[in-house]
């Protein structure tokens, strides 16, 4: 696995440019099992970053609806969804190697053939690798809320990002977000409502009930017992 999560960018004078990113690269230690999964299963399910569009049907070896998940953590929900929906192709992106290793291990144990994994900045992947109007769904579950006001600019859900997502969705494709931080949910709703070309699938024009397609996580179940809320938002590309 080529472990270049971000691609260096330079100005016309050769000086490195600094892009505001929604994540901090944490060099977590890999367990032996995670390292074994990276060594053994990355060649089968892993996808290296390239700064050019990829043919998604060739990538999966078949033509099927494509779901892109950004920031899958340890991959538990992603593997469950891929196992429950063999008629769909799933592409997961995560920047932290331990999560990639854990997901590869779980996917192998589940015998999945409809899942591909990337370890790179999702914004760069969307910008450069994903063809226009090629995705049936984009999933963004529990992204870092960046609680402090001075860090809000790091939140991944910003107008340029949701415009980028829209351009990669097919007409009728859906952008599904979930967060357990109410101020971030309100921020998501405000940003999404301000971008033309999206239709809010909520009957109340705000949040939707958790669809069965999104598995409950252990963290979420614990939060429910403690009375914590979770907000799901689903917006369809209409043009």
Swiss-Prot record:
One of its GO terms (cellular component) is tRNA methyltransferase complex. The active site is at residue 144. One of its GO terms (molecular function) is tRNA (guanine(46)-N7)-methyltransferase activity. Residues 150-155 are annotated as: Interaction with RNA. Pathway: tRNA modification; N(7)-methylguanine-tRNA biosynthesis. InterPro entries: SAM-dependent_MTases_sf, tRNA_(Gua-N-7)_MeTrfase_Trmb, tRNA_methyltr_TrmB_bact. Pfam families: Methyltransf_4. It catalyses: guanosine(46) in tRNA + S-adenosyl-L-methionine = N(7)-methylguanosine(46) in tRNA + S-adenosyl-L-homocysteine. S-adenosyl-L-methionine binds at residues 69, 94, 121, 144. Its EC number is 2.1.1.33. Keywords: Methyltransferase, S-adenosyl-L-methionine, Transferase, tRNA processing. Substrate binds at residues 148, 180, 217-220. Monomer. Belongs to the class I-like SAM-binding methyltransferase superfamily. TrmB family. NCBIfam families: tRNA (guanosine(46)-N7)-methyltransferase TrmB. Catalyzes the formation of N(7)-methylguanine at position 46 (m7G46) in tRNA. HAMAP family: tRNA_methyltr_TrmB (MF_01057). This is tRNA (guanine-N(7)-)-methyltransferase. It comes from Yersinia pseudotuberculosis serotype O:1b (strain IP 31758).
